[in-house]
Amino acid sequence: MKHIKYPCRFNIKTAAAGLLLLTVAFGSCKKDELDPNEVLQDGKSVVITDLAGDTQAAMGSGTPGKELRPFFTFLFRFRDQKQIWIRNAADSAQWLKTKDWDIAFTGPYNSEVYVNDKDYQFNPGFGGTAKSAVILLQQGYDTVNQAPSDEAFNASEVTKIGWASSAASNGWFFYSLNTHIMQAIPNRTYAIRLPDGKYVKLQLINAYKGNPPSVTDLNWPAPYYTFKYYVQQDGSKNLQTK
């Protein structure tokens, strides 16, 4: 079989035109790539991206730049997106038993979420003044248009939103004991009744920086929380956002 060698004729105008086309094509591809956070916007909901949790704590020893200790809890307030850290007894005394927060991110990698509830003994707000309730709705965030009945909230047994040990669990993520990686469960939305009677829908989306669709690297930066929520300000049960 003959090897055919084609003569090379370099034309600077042709090369320049080709480079321009390549640049335009590359730019078009970049524009076509969906920003995982931009697609979360619906014009009504509040979208929180890469909210840093306790990134200095570690579950095991020998992690560069991190300390082997429990993760500090942080609180979050819906009305003004305020993050409140609980690092010591003084912080606990100032905040935990008040109505000045709505959800608490606790436990390993701040992955265990509680609503502010004075009646549940393991809740950060136990013994305080706030009485919230939460219900898991197994449907996509955009399809949740109505809050459940008050009877359903009163009867709810959902206390902690964390690791889902099974599909029947109320948790928001699966956790692999082999890879030690968290993966948010699709079509899980949490309806919340706040102490002032307002209703909220909440979707916990990701615990990894940049909101990647999937993670295979155990060392991917975490916890950096992405979540979205909508508070119905008029007190009705209307939670439609699309």
What do the predicted segments below correspond to?
Residues 30-242:
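Surface-exposed, beta-sheet-biased, low-hydrophobicity segments with strongly acidic/polar composition
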Residues 24-28:
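C-terminal motif of bacterial Sec signal peptides marking the signal peptidase cleavage site
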Residues 16-23:
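Sec-dependent N-terminal signal peptides
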Residues 3-16:
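Bacterial N-terminal signal peptides that target proteins for export
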